[in-house]
Structures are given as structure tokens and as C-alpha cells.
Amino acid sequence: MLHTTVPPAIVIRAGGVACILLAMLVTSSHATDANPLTAPWQGPFGGVPPFDGVRVEHVAPALEAGMAEQLAAVERIAADPAPPTFDNTIAAFERSGRLLDRVMTVYGVLTGSLSDDALRAVEREMAPRLAAFQDAIVQNERLFARITAVHEGAEAAGLSPEQRRLAWLHATNLARAGARLDTRAKAELAAINQELATLHTTFAQNVLVEESDTAVFLDHEADLAGVPETARRAAADAAVARGRKGAWAIPNTRSSVEPFLTFADRRDLRERVWRMFVDRGDRGNAADNNGVVTRILALRARRAALLGFPTHAHWRLEDSMAKTPERAVALMEAVWKPAVARVREEVADMQAVADAEGAGITIAAWDYRYYAEKVRRARYDLDEAELAPYLQLDRLRDGMFFVAERLFGLRFEPLGVGEVPVFHPDVRVWRVADAGGETVGLWYFDPFARTGKRSGAWMSDYRPQERLDGRVLPLVSNNCNFVKPATGEPALLSWDDATTLFHEFGHALHGLCSDVAHPSLAGTRVARDYVELPSQLLEHWLSTPEVLERFAVHCETGRPIPAELVARIRRADAFNQGFRTVEFLGSALVDMRLHLAGAAPIDPERFERQTLETLGMPVEIVMRHRTPHFNHIFADDGYSAGYYSYLWADMLTADAWGAFGEAGGPWDADVAGRLRRHVLSAGNTIDPEEGYRRFRGRDPSIDALLRKRGFAPAVKPRSDLD
């Protein structure tokens, strides 16, 4: 999320930038005094973020200074008496906002990884002000006219393909954000955007509070029967951190909850932990998000109508690969039926195990992971507890580096402690170099969960690659929520955690391999349903023999993972895919239908329940993200009507992985070169469909996706997705 400051008394209106700028310059006249956030980044590698010197009181003044600087730059562009050209308009617009970009980088890290009450107060103050600031730029009619003139004028024919793409992108983005609306509509749109910014912040903060402040406490070690020793120690440490030494705590985060649900023998405690987790944001307390969701949906529907779209979903997907909600839904429905059929088989297998044990139960949602693990042990002689000692975080991280070097010639060299500032002692930094030793960028890694850090895993782009005014190195980070081990012990991952590790590293490589001139087109700044292609594709290298045999070594003996265990892992590759697919699609289809519903008031709980009933959601599975804590779609606009993107990208991923198979294996240099050239390095300089065709030689097919997940052939013909 972005957070910026505009004096709340200012009314945003078309052509009102000068008034806003004047007010902001007054409020921020002392913003740069001894403030590390407003100074150019110092240090090696073209400068690095000043994480070590920032305090919460620096944030608001720095944001004000950044906005004032960008608004002044925009006003100069808009008021330029010279005819609009690429250099004096498009390139100048690219250069505007560099100070604000630097401030927002650090601010985003603070609010996402080190949040506390003081920062949350700043977030609440800043959210609507940033929205107003953004609208002030969008609604500058002279700026839009100049950008459109370059995009549509005679000069466009003489621009490079990347320059034409950039001019098109800025003109399109401004138009989609309301630049063509009349004065009254612009005023209403600005008010909507400011309220939405506040609501998005409220939603995310409520989820963070629920995750940080709630846990299930266990008073007897017998309550952890079946739970691996590493998870027990983590639970004991979590209890100590919460003032309950001698007890055990299961925090309300996925990294703690899922291992408990997988291994804990006590069914009543599994249910208790499960309910804590799935009811985040839905408890009727101060952090309940249902009312927030209702209002967000209403405002999004109204905004879409103002912008000339039938629904929010139609607006969001216009610039995606899918293009329309109908195409996205067609893909989801093509996968839904075989996935549900597979779930029926999985549940039957689990019920048979429970019956054989004399459990006297009917499989419920809090039983799924537990009995699925039993089925996997019985069918494939494979279980998480056997795998975990081989999945050491540090060694698998080295395995990722091995993949990056072998495929793309990138080498990762650790920097010493204190060589560049970091925001927490857990964070480490690596210099990334090409085959010739030249620095490509920096990779920051923040692996462990902690209080004040939002849940999940993500890649952050501290600074995009560019060469508009000289070569600028990208600075990227991967952020995870793995359970931190006790001092002196290795961090051991589940297979899912290891997959997440490789997934996020795929995003990092997308940023590090970027090779474009303009920052707005760099790295991961691509369509939402395309950006997951590099990340999901890199997951495949985790299970290659070359990675497992070298880097999956036992934490005590140091011996590599046995070949027969690797064979069992590969045989179990499609295991439990019904569950994984249905829990995802439940969330993705509810997301899409919420945003196709139009302007009618929505009760989130009722809508979710009725939608899942209509779909035929198996009762043994709950959505991966229930509506009241669905940060992807309600903490900002990011994945709203776009959670399907992971499936769309996985269709591309399965098809792209096939290119390596057709060429003889995962290390084929020619295929890797095409992947880097046409996908990773190209950023948004070309249309993603064209970029994929250049890499693959054709359009993708859904059949590879269904084969990957172990499902039947496509239910719908490929033409339904065209």
C-alpha cells in the first residue's frame, strides 16, 4: 500500500494541482530538516535504503516533502509552453517522484514488517491523503493532454518500441483512473478513492491485530502429541514471547497453524486452532471486517460505474492478460469440476483411514491436513516429519542460488554484517553478480515470522532497475514467515515452505534480471496475471534431482537426501492437488463473484456461504482466504477481482515448464535464455501475450495445467479461453 499526506481540508478537483501544491509546500516547509528519509540514499551500489536511522516521526514529514516535490515536477511538465515531446513530457514524468519513491520504500518496509501502534496511527492518517495526492496527478488535465499528445501524435512513429509502450502505458493508466471524467465526476471519484484508502488500511490493520494478538495456549505437553519437536520448541518460544513461560502457544499465523493441523493428534485442539485461524476478521469484535468489506464493495462498484464499466471486475481485468472476467471464470470453471472430483476421492481415502483406526468420525475441515498426511504416509511412504530434517532453510537458499547461476549466470555473494543497513537483525543481504563479476543488484532476505510483520510471503522492489539517466541497480527483497528456530538450531521447512521459498525467489529474479530503460516498465511491473509466471515456474526446480541431491542434506548427519526418498517425493507430486486447487478456487471464485455483483449491498458472510453452496464447495474444505481476512483483495486494490491470477499464471507455468521438457530437461540453456530474454528481462516493454509467444513459440494450453495437477483432460475446449 501507498501512504502520502495531503492537507485534509483541500478539495481535489480537476486542474487543482497548483492549489494542492501550494498548500503542501507550506505544510512541508521544514520536512527535510535532519530527516534521513529525505536525503539521497548513500553508500555502495548506487545508494541503499537508510533503514538504520529512521524513526516513526520521520515518516509523515518525509512523505509531505516527497509529494510536494513530485507535484511541483508535474506542474512544471503540465505548464511547459513547449510542444509536448517524449523527452519533455513522458521522460520528465518518469523522473518525477524519485524522492517519494525512496520514502515509500522504507515506509512500506516499516508498515509491513515492523508495524506497531505508532506506525498504524501514521498509516490511518496517511492513507486518504495519498489517495488525494494521486488523484491530483490523475486529474491534471494539462498533464493528460500532453501525455496523450505524445502517445497519439506524429512523434510516436519515430519512438523506439519501448518508448511507444511507455507513452501508451501512461496515457492508458491516466484514462483508466478517470482523467477523462468531467469536474463533478472527478470530485466524486476523488472522494471514493480517499475513503477506499482508509478502508483498505483499516481492513489490513484489523487482520494484523487478529494475527498478532490471538493464539491458542496449551498448558500440557500431552496436548502436542504428534507434533514434531521443532514445532513444539517454536510453540514454547511463542508462549514465552507472550508472557506464558511453561506453556505452549499456537499463534494465529499460517506458518504456525498448518503444522499443528497436520500433526496434532488431539482432534478437539485441531478444531480450536482451525476456528481461530479461519475466523480472523469475523468475530464480531473491534477487528471485525464484515462492515468494512460491505463498504469497500459498494465504493468499488460506484467507482467502476463512474469510469464507464459494468462492474469493478470488468475495470480491473481490462488491462490484464485475461482481458475480461468471462475468460478468467472460464478457466476457473474448467479446473473446478475435475478438482472437486479429486477432492471426493481424497476424502474417501481419508475416511477409510479414520474408519480403519476406529476414530468414529466423519472427516471435517480440521481433519483434512491430518488425515491427508496419514494417507500420504500409507500410499507413498512419505511424511513431512521424515522430510523436514533435509529441508534446511540455509541449504535450500543455497540451492536457489545454484539454480540462478546455472540458468542465468547469476552469483550471490553475502555481504558482511553492517556493510549495508538492514531493518531487523534477521535480515541478510547478498550482492548479485553476473558471470563476468559485474554487480547486477542486491537481494535482501527476511525469512522469519515476528510480531508486527504481516502474514504470508512476498517480494518487495526497493528500487527498480533502469537506465534512463544512467545505470541503476535493482534492490529487491524476499520476505517470509517461517518459524524461527531456537538459537544454534537450523531452521527446518515443510515442503510447502520450501516451495514458497522458491516461489518468492522467482519474483526476485524477475526484478534482478530486468533490462529496460524506464522504471515504470521494469521487472515485475507487468499485468497481475502474468507476474506470477516467473515465481510459479521457479518452484519446479525445487524437486529436481540436481537441487535435492546437493542441497537437501540431513541437519544432523549431513548426508544428502536418499535417492529413494527423492523418488517418493516425485511420485507424490500430484498428491492432495484436489484440496490445494479447491481451497484456492473457492477464494478466487468468491473474489470474482463479489466484484461482479454490482451495486447491490452485500452481506459478506451470506454472500460467501451462498456462493460456495452454489459452486458445490466440499464441506471438508474451507476457502484458503475467507472474505473477512482476504488481504489480497481488500487490503488494497491489488488482487481485487484478480486472485484468479495465480491459476492463470499456473496455466502459463505448466505450459512453460513443458518447453524445458521438450528440450531435454530443466537446465536447457537455450530455453533458459529465451525465458530470460523474453520474460524476465523484458518487463513490461512488450505485451505479455507477445512476450510469452516469443518465449514458447505459441499460445499456452490449459491441458498442461490439468496434467500437472493430475486431473482429467480439459472439460472445456481451448477456444472457450481464447
Where are these regions (language model features)?
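Bacterial N-terminal signal peptides
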Residues: 15-27
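Short pre-active-site segment immediately N-terminal to the catalytic Zn-binding motif
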Residues: 483-501
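N-terminal helix-rich structural modules
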Residues: 4, 32-233, 722
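Active-site-proximal, well-structured secondary-structure segments within enzyme catalytic domains
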Residues: 162, 166-168, 198, 205, ...
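Short His/Asp/Glu-rich catalytic/ion-coordination signatures at enzyme active sites or charged loops
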Residues: 43-58, 107-126, 149-191, 251-291, ...
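Intrinsically disordered or highly flexible coil/loop and linker segments, enriched in small
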Residues: 68, 72, 76-83, 99-116, ...
